[in-house]
């Protein structure tokens, strides 16, 4: 009896103990690890994971490994090593690990964000980038679309003059409409029931993915009942059903001679492939309806909640730092005034606002840990060997809070991105990658930067953003899920007197 138990344990240890492909190679230091459970018993159980990994650097250095269940994961916490992974050896490390929850979200690894490296991912990323090229100028210029939605946002907020509100949903609506126009030329009216559906499934997906799920570490557990997985599946189905409805309706309107949005680009690519008019890398099997819908879903998922969250973080930090907010108002008044609305060209004049956005992206990165990468081949990071199939996580929090790179990294200091005279934007450190880098960098970076600048410039021009009368300031602790969320808070919205007077003069 005991001999059989011992034999079973030895067999499990052999199967699940980390194996080195190159016995003589030098590997990163590793946390203690046990068969089956890996390093889990030795990881801190309290606090945010990104911060815990950052603290472990003091003992293990800027690169080390942990055993997450049965998989080896290398944690990278220095900008030079991170750029080696993302840029210098970007192709080596451009794979994506297979993760149960993300497989559900991506309809079995389709789309862009969570798809593994290969022909499918390359094709869909290229087509998505081609879509953004449609919005460079003319009536479809990205800035024009963004400003149209911000104008509607500001008009809605003005109806709450003097009130204390949560700006989350109004900002969500504006950004959803920008993404929706880019994807399929649809802009939702306030009160449209589909908006609520999008908002609900979006929140449900983020909440489900934010729960630490053992099934991601031990995939065999998915055979057992799992409330989190079932909830995720329900919300993904709701998303897929809505996108399918939009897609089916749009098929009747599609014209190959009028390509104006992402759905047009993807459908044209599919048509060309079906007709034999595409290159060898454009296989029609990679452009099925399911592939197309997942890519659209990726753009929605990546483009809405991220920017909405950053806008809220910016407002929260301004409520905590009224002296910065005061200077921002002065900059708006002096450089833009009230006879026109802010434009992207004002970036060159509203330097403190741009610096504030950069500082918020540093101190509260959208994703404190970038989506995990996977080694496609046997490779190396720095002096250390990394075997094919190894997972690699860039701890962006560590890069953005390194005391050797940033003066008082836990302090909100927008001026760090300005020269001493405040007349020029600077890069104070190379340890700054808010949108990632390399082959897997955020394809919506230009869109996000424009949205953040324009939304904040318009809000500051029109409204006083004040702490509620009860003095309740937002918590800056945050809740790191797929996106680093800020806890719900309220802000007192007041139409600025100078704006009101300028509008009165203009109407006479």
Curated annotation (Swiss-Prot):
Cofactor(s) it depends on: heme
Gene: CYP17A1
Organism: Papio hamadryas ursinus
Localisation: Endoplasmic reticulum membrane; Microsome membrane
GO-annotated molecular function: heme binding; iron ion binding; lyase activity; steroid 17-alpha-monooxygenase activity
Catalytic reaction annotation: a C21-steroid + reduced [NADPH--hemoprotein reductase] + O2 = a 17alpha-hydroxy-C21-steroid + oxidized [NADPH--hemoprotein reductase] + H2O + H(+); progesterone + reduced [NADPH--hemoprotein reductase] + O2 = 17alpha-hydroxyprogesterone + oxidized [NADPH--hemoprotein reductase] + H2O + H(+); pregnenolone + reduced [NADPH--hemoprotein reductase] + O2 = 17alpha-hydroxypregnenolone + oxidized [NADPH--hemoprotein reductase] + H2O + H(+); 17alpha-hydroxypregnenolone + reduced [NADPH--hemoprotein reductase] + O2 = 3beta-hydroxyandrost-5-en-17-one + acetate + oxidized [NADPH--hemoprotein reductase] + H2O + 2 H(+)
Keyword set includes Iron: yes
EC class of the enzyme, as a word: oxidoreductase
UniProt binding sites for substrate: 202
Gene Ontology biological-process entries: glucocorticoid biosynthetic process; hormone biosynthetic process; progesterone metabolic process; steroid metabolic process
Gene Ontology cellular-component annotations: endoplasmic reticulum membrane
Name the UniProt record assigns to this protein: Steroid 17-alpha-hydroxylase/17,20 lyase
E.C. code: 1.14.14.19, 1.14.14.32
């Amino acid at each position: 009896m005991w001999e059989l138990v011992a034999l079973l344990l030895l067999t499990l240890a052999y199967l699940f103990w980390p194996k080195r492909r190159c016995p003589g190679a030098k590997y990163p230091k590793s946390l203690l690890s046990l068969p089956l459970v890996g390093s889990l018993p030795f990881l801190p159980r309290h606090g945010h994971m990104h911060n815990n990994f950052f603290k472990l650097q003091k003992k293990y250095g800027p690169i080390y490994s942990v055993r997450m269940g049965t998989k080896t994961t290398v944690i990278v916490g220095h900008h030079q090593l991170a750029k080696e992974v993302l840029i210098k050896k970007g192709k080596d490390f451009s794979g994506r690990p297979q993760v149960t929850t993300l497989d559900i979200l991506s309809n079995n690894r389709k789309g862009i964000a969570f798809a593994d490296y290969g022909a499918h991912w390359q094709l869909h990323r290229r087509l998505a980038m081609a879509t953004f090229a449609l919005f460079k100028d003319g009536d479809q210029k990205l800035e024009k679309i963004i400003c149209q939605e911000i104008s509607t946002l500001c008009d809605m907020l003005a109806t709450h003059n003097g009130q204390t509100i949560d700006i989350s949903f109004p900002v969500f609506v504006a950004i959803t409409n920008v993404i929706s126009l880019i994807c399929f030329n649809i802009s939702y009216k306030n009160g449209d029931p589909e908006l609520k559906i999008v908002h609900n499934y979006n929140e449900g997906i983020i909440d489900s993915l934010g729960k630490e799920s053992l099934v991601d570490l031990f995939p065999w557990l998915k055979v057992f009942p799992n409330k989190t997985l079932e909830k995720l599946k329900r919300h993904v189905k709701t998303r897929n059903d809505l996108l399918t409805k939009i897609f089916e309706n749009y098929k009747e309107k599609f014209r190959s001679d009028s390509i104006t949005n992402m759905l047009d680009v993807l459908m044209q690519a599919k048509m060309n492939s079906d007709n034999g008019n595409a290159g060898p890398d454009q296989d029609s099997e990679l452009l099925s309806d399911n592939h197309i819908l997942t890519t659209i879903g990726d753009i929605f998922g990546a483009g809405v909640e991220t920017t909405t969250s950053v806008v809220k973080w910016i407002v929260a930090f301004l409520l905590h730092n009224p002296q910065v907010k005061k200077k921002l108002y002065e900059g708006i008044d002096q450089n833009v005034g009230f006879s026109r609305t802010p434009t992207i060209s004002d970036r060159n004049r509203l330097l403190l606002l741009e610096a504030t956005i950069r500082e918020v992206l540093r101190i509260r990165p959208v994703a404190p840990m970038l989506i995990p990468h996977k080694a496609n081949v046997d490779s190396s990071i720095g002096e250390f060997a990394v075997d094919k199939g190894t997972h690699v996580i860039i701890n962006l929090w560590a890069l953005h809070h390194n005391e050797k790179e940033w003066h008082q990294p836990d302090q909100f200091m927008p001026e760090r991105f300005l020269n001493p005279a405040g007349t020029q934007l600077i890069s104070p450190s190379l340890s700054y990658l808010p949108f990632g880098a390399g082959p897997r960098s955020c394809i919506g970076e230009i869109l996000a930067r424009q949205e953040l600048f324009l939304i904040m410039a318009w809000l500051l021009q029109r409204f006083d953003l004040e702490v509620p009368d009860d003095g309740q300031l937002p918590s800056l602790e945050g809740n790191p899920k797929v996106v680093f969320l800020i806890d719900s808070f309220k802000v007192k919205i007041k139409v600025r007197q100078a704006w009101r007077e300028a509008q009165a003069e203009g109407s006479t």
